[in-house]
């Protein structure tokens, strides 16, 4: 942990008393908001007068070019976004361990996509949405603020980037780390910092809360901080009972009765637009509205094109950890630029937030900006890592002396774009890597991690509908047993272990069962 500041904890002079965060999935800035430059020329996006392109081959100076268009579909395939794929997208060549890093030319998106699927670059990776296709974002960009310099925290996939949102580190993970996921990631989070300084937080989940990737969040003391979104969020807004820090987790599984609204390809962006609309309208109607900052951001770019070079100089390693062989990643460069919207009655219409003014000359907006902003606005006692100490803070966007009274009460309506046949078919689709990680975390809560099938075969035969039911059942059971244990007065630092009850009269454990039992044990 970074050394504690001398200011101590307590409230600041900021008018913001509640920060609401929604982290969506796998879209780049240019893909979602690049064409919004047509609405506001100050946005660093794309335009027809300055066309952007990538070559089919970066090694051929005479290569044909694929130009960035505005014909993205609501339901897209899922491009490559592994560490290796991102390296090629950013630097225009396959991974090498060069030091220092080469110049990030952002010219390898087409080459990488074509190696995966012929035609994917022109139809998917090099396409974006025009503003009229994303009417909720269109109104929010015009009415509030867009940040055109927010990068993912590292050039990798969902899990490590989401870990930075609340902890300013992935604890050395730069891809799915199943062993650590079993134990629970051990790093301190901003949730503990808020609690220690007397502030409140709530996690409003829709399918499975990935905040449970952090080990501490599984403890009995935090069981009452988890709320079902559809049962609690609008009610808490209406009653003025939102906590100081609100985390909204979208639906990560697309089923017919409740389509996914996390914007992950192939999920329909209409569902994501409707989720943002629903959240905004509930916040706008709340008596707490004049004290709210609502942040919408995406965890990583998902393999979609973006033209702004990723920062490779002056990015601090958060905690001295280095990624595994063969890449030995030092966590010293950021990922690709992602969409970010900032919404509050304290923001002037049409604001564009560019690079931050400090705290360091190389500082950038990235996911660690969220805990950094919480620390600054709520005057928390200490930083979490060197990364949130370095990251830009969002308070600069609060650029008024009084709250606006003309903020829209409602946002545009969007029709759902899929029919019953498509929805049923998608319930039978294979799982994404992140969905598999959610299953693995759910298995630990349920006690299934002691079985020989964990983690490698547990999700093998699951489709989307099976997985959605599994994680919901696992969390419901874990949460219910945790509530009972807390009501019984058990140690607040305890984590309920459902495997004990299920194995009390079972046969002796196999080696694999013993191994995974060891992995989740603090000792």
Swiss-Prot record:
The keyword Hydrolase belongs to this UniProt entry's keyword annotation: yes
Enzyme class: hydrolase
Gene null: resulting phenotype: No visible phenotype under normal growth conditions.
MF-aspect GO terms: lysophosphatidic acid phosphatase activity
Pfam families: Phosphoesterase
Induction (free text): Induced by auxin in roots. Not induced by inorganic phosphate deprivation.
An example Gene Ontology biological process: phosphate-containing compound metabolic process
Any one GO CC term of the record: plasmodesma
Function according to Swiss-Prot or TrEMBL: Possesses specific phosphatase activity toward lysophosphatidic acid (LPA) in vitro. Does not show phospholipase C activity. May play a role in signal transduction and storage lipid synthesis. May be involved in brassinolide-mediated signaling in root development.
Family per record: Belongs to the bacterial phospholipase C family.
Name recorded for this polypeptide: Non-specific phospholipase C3
This protein's encoding gene: NPC3
